[in-house]
Every structure is written in C-alpha cells, then in structure tokens.
A protein has these predicted regions:
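Glycine-/small-residue-enriched transmembrane alpha-helix faces in small-molecule transporters
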Residues: 1-38, 145-174, 196-199, 221
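Residue-level signature of transmembrane alpha-helical cores of multipass secondary-active transporters
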Residues: 7-12, 70-74, 98, 127, ...
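Specific transmembrane alpha-helical segments of multi-pass solute transporters/efflux pumps
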Residues: 19, 54-101, 136, 223-224
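Membrane-interface helix termini and inter-helical loops of multi-pass transporters
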Residues: 21-32, 58-59, 90, 138-150, ...
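Transmembrane alpha-helices of multi-pass small-molecule transport proteins
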Residues: 28-80, 107-111, 129, 163-168, ...
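Specific alpha-helical transmembrane segments that line the substrate/conduction pathway
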Residues: 34-35, 40-41, 85-118
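Hydrophobic transmembrane alpha-helices of multi-pass small-molecule transport proteins
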Residues: 47, 121-141
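Membrane-interface helix-boundary motifs at transmembrane edges
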Residues: 55-65, 113-122, 173-184
C-alpha cells in the first residue's frame, strides 16, 4: 500500500513538472510543436539506450503482427495526446492545465463501453466529485487570470488529449496482451509514434526554425 502511494506521489510530481516545463518553454518563446516532438524523440533515444537487444527484438516481432494497429494507436495514445496537451500550454497557465488534466480520469471511465464493459458508476461519481473539488479550488484563480476564450480552447485541447491517451493506450494493451512487458510496450509505442513526431518536427522547422538550446534542455528534462 505504501509503495503504491509513493509511486503515485512520484508520478504526480513528474507529471506536474511536465506542465510547468511546457509553460516555461512557451513563455520563453519556444514552440509547442518542438516541445511535443522533442519530448518523444528524446524519449525514444533514452529507451533505445536502456532497452536490451532481446527486448527490442521481441518488440519488433510483436509489432510485425499488427503494424497498422500499432501505428494507429501509438499515434493516438502518444501523438495526439501529447500534441494537444502541449498546445494547451499556449492558452493557459500550468496550474490551469494541470487542473484540467484531471478530466482524463472521467474520459477514461466513459470510454469503458468501447472495451466491452459497463461504465463503473462508483469510480465515475468519485472522479466527478474530485473534479468538482478541483474546480472550486481553482475558480477564483480562473476569475483573476481573466483568460476568457483561451480557457475554453485549453479545455477543448485537454479533452482531446484526455480522450486520446486512455483510448490509445488501452487499445494497445488489449492488442498486446501479455506478449510484452510494460517497458517493452512503452518502447514500441514510442517507436511507432515517431513518424507523427518527425512530421511535427518538420512543420516546426518550417514555421519557427530550429529549437533553442534552452528548449532542447527543457524537452530533455521532460523526456526523463
């Protein structure tokens, strides 16, 4: 129990750091196109460095069975998810995006029928109750910040990200089953989302030029 709580706290810390670093890159003139694509490019290189040869071979064999599904759901679960989450940082403060991200729990529960199960009402009500609490805590900050239409755009982007993330990941888990470990599945999805990220990186180069040293460093920290 203590181990689970500790893992949850550490995970929450690193995810919160992601929102802060994304906002920091935005405020210093960095493009969200680079913020999103660099995170997964660096992440792939890090995983490539630490994955054993046998594990990489196993992943490639599993991918070869259903390459189209891997490409689709990896792009959805990693690509669309992080693209829109990074884009949201252009329209709201890190605390606001972090608060909105709690919506992903509700989105994940509402997607349950797509996997042949009924919506679990108790977890749904608990998640909604938590969301109400988060909203009440941040309501005054929202009024003071005077974000206006930007808050609505950020909400839409986070909803897209919050839907793509659980849908893509759970679909991949259903396809893979027990044939891969969690780390191998992470490596495989990162690998198969690379075509999407390379396209985003090419668009970023065309629109804003190459990323700054500061953005490269911060993106590397997010990837870690």
């Amino acid at each position: 129990m203590r181990k689970s709580v500790l893992i949850g706290i550490v995970s929450a810390f690193f995810f919160t750091a992601t929102f802060i670093l994304n906002r920091s890159m935005n405020l210093t003139g960095g493009s969200f196109l680079w913020a999103s694509s660099l995170r997964f490019i660096f992440m792939f290189l890090i995983l490539l460095l630490f994955m054993k040869k046998d594990s990489r071979k196993n992943v490639k064999e599993v991918i070869s069975i259903n390459p189209k599904y891997w490409l689709l759901y990896s792009t959805m679960g990693f690509g669309l998810f992080y693209f829109f989450l990074s884009a949201a940082s252009d329209y709201g403060e890190s605390w606001f995006i972090a608060s909105l991200w709690q919506l992903t729990t509700v989105c994940g529960i509402l997607l349950t029928p797509l996997f042949g199960h009924k919506i679990p009402l108790k977890p749904l009500f608990i998640s909604i109750f938590i969301l109400i609490g988060v909203f009440l805590l941040q309501y005054e900050n929202i009024l003071v910040s005077n974000m206006g239409n930007k808050a609505f755009i950020a909400l839409i982007f986070v909803l897209i990200a919050g839907t793509a993330y659980p849908l893509g990941n759970r679909k991949m888990m259903a396809i893979v089953g027990d044939s891969l470990t969690a780390m191998e599945r992470l490596y495989g999805m990162t690998l198969m989302s690379l075509p999407f990220w390379l396209i985003i990186a090419a668009i970023a180069t065309y629109k804003v030029g190459l990323p700054s040293i500061s953005q490269l460093f911060q993106s590397f920290l997010v990837a870690l």
